């Protein structure tokens, strides 16, 4: 049994398979997920687990060189925006509709129980060397 890092077997498998510039999404429970993208649903009920909780655990286990978020998060969800800017990882913003279109390039979407608007981010994998 693993002692450290993400215990969810599907998330651990995806993280271990990422190469440089591969992308995964951490999403609220309302984001539409493209049919061809794996969905790892960790939601238990509204708000559990939260977007911020899942983001923190993934960032502790994944090398991330960039984030992509919806432009609307800045005004519509200041708490999530603070969490994103607090990572000190460069953020590129897109209009929400374009953000949704971009998720089709992800290897997986991790669906949280988050129920606040625009609580979604695309993480671009970096390298550890």
Swiss-Prot record:
TM annotation in the entry: none
Enzyme Commission number, as recorded: 5.4.99.62
Binding site for substrate: 28, 96, 118-120
Keywords: Carbohydrate metabolism, Cytoplasm, Isomerase
UniProt key word rRNA-binding: no
UniProt-listed GO biological process terms: D-ribose catabolic process
Record's subcellular location: Cytoplasm
Active site location: 20
Principal location listed in the UniProt entry: cytoplasm
Pathway: Carbohydrate metabolism; D-ribose degradation; D-ribose 5-phosphate from beta-D-ribopyranose: step 1/2
GO MF annotation list: D-ribose pyranase activity; intramolecular lyase activity; monosaccharide binding
A GO-annotated cellular component: cytosol
Catalytic activity of the protein: beta-D-ribopyranose = beta-D-ribofuranose
Quaternary structure and partners: Homodecamer.
Family label: Belongs to the RbsD / FucU family. RbsD subfamily.
Role this protein plays: Catalyzes the interconversion of beta-pyran and beta-furan forms of D-ribose.
Protein name: D-ribose pyranase
């Amino acid at each position: 049994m693993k002692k450290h890092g993400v215990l969810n077997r599907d998330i651990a498998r995806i993280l271990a398979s990422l190469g440089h510039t591969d992308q995964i999404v951490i999403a609220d429970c309302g984001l539409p997920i493209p049919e061809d993208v794996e969905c790892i649903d960790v939601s238990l009920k509204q708000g559990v687990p939260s977007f911020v909780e899942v983001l923190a655990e993934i960032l502790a286990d994944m090398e991330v060189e960039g984030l992509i978020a919806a432009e609307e998060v800045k005004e519509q969800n200041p708490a999530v925006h603070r969490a994103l800017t607090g990572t000190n990882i460069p953020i590129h913003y897109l209009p929400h509709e374009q953000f949704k279109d971009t998720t089709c390039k992800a290897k997986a979407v991790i669906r949280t129980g988050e129920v606040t608007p625009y609580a979604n981010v695309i993480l671009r994998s970096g390298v550890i060397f």
